[in-house]
């Protein structure tokens, strides 16, 4: 296929057009008074969002050269989202500002490579200054503020995220689901829960709630199917003598074995319940081992030479309480040794770092949290499906932002931190004048997020930016109320990781785009050439 090629200013102006189209659509969502974007869907209701990366991902341009520019800025938003979970709109605004000023400098005859070096030098220095300005985010109040800001000033969402982090710890697993009602609720599952219920309703002990409740049970963990009751008899006899209930977790319990367990349970000979082990294949083996670690038991597996007929009481795990319904099993207060549990959690964390799959990472994080202390589920409530999706996006953003804040601390929000960093770096110089221009391009761009927030409020950006520049420390502009003051005291804070990631990714892609001299794409195919008429088939004449 033949190619279309553009050089120099021709290529750069097309690329800038694409950047501007995407950035203009994204940046109207920035700040507390940012507007919504409505996205048409090929099925279902349109999506309403204020999430920068969601808007960016929807944009594809007809002109292939413009589209290349748009896709590169889309990459800025995606990378920032992957690294920090928020700050995608800020990153897009920064990238647009650096690219626009940088391309003007190239058109004026500056050396693109020196401009890039100047920009890179500035960003490196700015990241170091951001870390100095950062303050730790450890208390519940600060976490609430970060969540509130990231959820578009929705205090309810900030409060719920802070409560969730309080319950399961800063590193605990917090998942977001669509709720059934109008209110957003927090559901905390203490202990280890997995999505397997009882194998027979005849095991039920509480018919009102439809659950099996076992107090101080023994727990038998088996990595195979159990079909023959003879294998289970020694364990059942030992547990019956100890006058304790028994929970069996196995690949499956079927036929004669299941029927005998049900009969024993109904006659009151031994209180017992059987459930399938969670997961499949290697993941099932790993999760059985997790349960064994938590309950101080041993997984009975023929692979390591353990036979079910020789099981002793010492091989069984124990817990304070187990609650099982038709869908889930929850093990509360296993008696496992804390040092062994911590070692298992550390081992899983190493696997998370080594994993390249997002799905595997998510599953490993869930396993780690279940061992470490529980899972919190935020159930998002809304009146309509459209509102539900929009609100769920905001909760996801807020959750990522609070995690980032706990990780690297917080700085003054509303674009103020970057303005302060730019002021500190005013005296920065490069090796030549072209590098100095690159430094000035990056420093000017650092004001762009503040200016855009103010523009989205309908105020005069230059006046506000000038007032903020003249202030010191955390002094800034509260876009919600239109007042000036200490941003930290007003609760307007940004995670340092979000500000840092936005600046680094924006500058990285923008600097590369400034050094572009040639663009190549497939030449558009004419419609007539793309779909030739179907010829006649032998013996059938021409086809109409």
Swiss-Prot record:
Record EC number: 5.6.1.7
Reactions mediated catalytically: ATP + H2O + a folded polypeptide = ADP + phosphate + an unfolded polypeptide
A UniProt-annotated Pfam family: Cpn60_TCP1
GO biological processes: protein refolding
The keyword Chaperone appears for this protein: yes
A single GO molecular function term of this UniProt record: ATP binding
CC per GO annotation: cytoplasm
Homology family: Belongs to the chaperonin (HSP60) family.
UniProt function note: Together with its co-chaperonin GroES, plays an essential role in assisting protein folding. The GroEL-GroES system forms a nano-cage that allows encapsulation of the non-native substrate proteins and provides a physical environment optimized to promote and accelerate protein folding.
Assembly notes: Forms a cylinder of 14 subunits composed of two heptameric rings stacked back-to-back. Interacts with the co-chaperonin GroES.
Name listed for the protein in its UniProt record: Chaperonin GroEL 1
Gene: groEL1
